Each structure stands twice: as C-alpha cells, then as structure tokens.
C-alpha cells in the first residue's frame, strides 16, 4: 500500500490548470520531496492531500483513504505545516501548541512535557513569553513546524518548512524531520531549495507546470545526467596526449580535455565507478596520478536537465 497515491489528478483555478493529470505515489515510511519552482503545483498538491482544497478531477488517497469522500479520516491521520505560519495573534507559543495538541487528541498528561521538549528542540523556549504577533519570521515558522513535531502524525506535510529560517535553524528542523521519519511517519516536503531537498529526501519528485517530470533518489537523478560528473586530474607521465586518448575510451567517459601538460578535465558518468578504472589505466601507462578532484551535478543541474530551465530562474 502506498502512503499517498494520486491518479489523473487535476486542479483548475479559472483558466489556470495548476495540476495536469498528476500520477504520483509516496511509499510508506519515506521522506518524499517535491522540488519545483513557484507555480509548479507543489502547494496545490499539498493542499489537496491536506483536504483544504478539492481536486477538479482525478483521485487522491492518503493511507488508502480518499481525500474527498473520507476527508475527516484523512485529517485524523495526517498533519500539515503550512507555508505561511498560522497562529492566534495574541496568544503565546505554548498556548498555540497546547491548543493544537488538544484538537489532535494528545492526552492531557503528556501535553506539557511534549510541548516543552519540542520548543527546546527548535530553540523556541526563550520565546515562550512572546505573543505570536511579536515573533520574528523565523520564530513563527519554527512554531508552525513545531505543531507537527508535537502531533507526530502518520502522514506529515511540510510546505517549505525552513523559509525565513537561518542556516542553524534549518539544520535543526531537518534533523527533527529525519527523526520523525525514523519513528515511522511518512513525510512529504515541498521546497524550491536544492540544499534542503538533497539533505532531506529519500526520493525526489521534480514538478514543473503541474506535472511530475521525474522521480528517483538523489544519487540516481544525478547519475542520469550523462557526463554530469567532472573529474579534474593532475598527472605526471611521458605522453599526456596519449593518456587523453586512452581515457577517452574508458566506459563512462563523455569527453576528456587537456587543460595543460599535466592537468586534465574529464566529463564522465558515475565518477565513483570511473575513477578506479582511470587510476588503473594510468598505472598501466606509467603515468602517476598526483591529484583527483570530483565535482558532481547539483539538483539545479538535474532540474535543468529534465525541464530545460534552471530552478533558480524558474523560481523568480
């Protein structure tokens, strides 16, 4: 059973089609990251799965429960941290989390200790005396995701969980999301930050213009770019031109260029398999390898490869 499954899912806003027949699945117990620019359909998909929006057509299920015909049951087994932090303006963080814990059915005897621990984990404890309206943007966002760490649902939705949060805060939230997954929750994260996607994802689905373009692990997505790995070599041997010719014949090589007499640059697929073969070949040709530097494709490169545009450009 999939934790999430959509079939031919569409959502129409007037003349704009946000989702265009989306077929999408999430395995139980994984972190699935939706990577795409603003307007790609990420938030629309999340809001449908959270039962906030109804699809125009198609079906969507969470833990085999239909989000339209059994929406109450879906809300009982899932939780959502929204893109924009939500809270009662004149309430304090503990009051907001206490209210959330109550409506989620967390026993009264467990609430206070759980809320205190989550607030300390997210470095919100020192802000416990502030009103929501006086929290900084980063504090408000951490409070929004804190709701799910208090609730700990079977299916957790995070819409851009670290927007407005500094790097230290991002890492704290990422670690807590991993912890939630390790405890058995299935997690769906929407983001346009490649570093966040790479850090969190068990698998990534690239969304563009309401469609799923590709879905796989980070490693396989990067390996799918032919010649995407760049290997820079410093060598010492009798004939650099000859070694360029020989390296060009190795399996996985797309192109080898001599930068100067001793420095080569190779564009290869799957550098982790190519480098050992390269060193063995150089040894056979009496050429010493003095240094090796490998640069792999970024997720922005992956997005560019599959959509024809840069994620950074598409997001602006």
Outline where the language-model segments fall:
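ABC transporter nucleotide-binding domain
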Residues: 176-269
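Conserved ABC transporter NBD signature motif
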Residues: 58-66, 73-74
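Conserved ABC ATPase signature
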Residues: 131-135
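Catalytic Walker B motif of ABC-type/P-loop ATPase nucleotide-binding domains
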Residues: 156-159
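Helix-to-loop junction immediately C-terminal to a conserved catalytic motif
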Residues: 50
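Conserved ABC ATPase "signature" region
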Residues: 98, 102, 109-127
């Amino acid at each position: 059973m999939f934790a999430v499954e959509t079939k031919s899912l569409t959502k129409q806003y007037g003349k704009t089609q946000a989702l265009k027949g989306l077929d999408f699945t999430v395995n139980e117990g994984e972190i699935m990251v939706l990577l795409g620019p603003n307007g790609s359909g990420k938030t629309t998909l999340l809001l449908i799965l959270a039962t906030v929006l109804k699809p125009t057509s198609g079906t969507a299920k969470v833990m085999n429960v239909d989000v339209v015909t059994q929406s109450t049951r879906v809300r009982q087994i899932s939780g959502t941290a929204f893109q924009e932090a939500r809270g009662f303006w004149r309430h304090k963080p503990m009051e907001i989390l206490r209210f959330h814990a109550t409506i989620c059915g967390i026993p009264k005897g467990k609430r206070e200790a759980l809320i205190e621990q989550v607030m300390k984990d997210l470095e919100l404890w020192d802000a416990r005396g502030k009103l929501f309206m006086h929290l900084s943007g980063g504090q408000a966002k951490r409070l929004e995701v804190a709701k799910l760490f208090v609730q700990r649902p079977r299916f957790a939705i995070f819409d851009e969980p670290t927007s407005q949060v500094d790097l230290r805060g991002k890492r704290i939230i990422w670690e807590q999301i991993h912890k939630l997954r390790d405890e058995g929750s299935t997690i769906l994260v929407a983001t346009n930050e490649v570093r966040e996607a790479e850090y969190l994802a068990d698998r990534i689905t690239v969304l563009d213009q309401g469609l799923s373009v590709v879905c796989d692990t980070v490693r396989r997505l990067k390996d799918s770019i032919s010649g995407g790995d760049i290997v820079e070599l410093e060598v010492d041997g009798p004939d650099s031109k000859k070694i360029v010719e020989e390296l060009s014949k190795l399996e996985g090589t797309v192109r080898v260029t001599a930068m100067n007499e001793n420095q080569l640059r190779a564009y290869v697929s799957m550098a982790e398999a190519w480098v050992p073969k390269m060193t063995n070949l150089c040894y056979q040709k009496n050429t010493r390898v003095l240094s090796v530097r490998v640069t792999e494709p970024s997720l922005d490169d992956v997005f560019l490869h599959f959509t024809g545009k840069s994620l950074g450009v598409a997001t602006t």
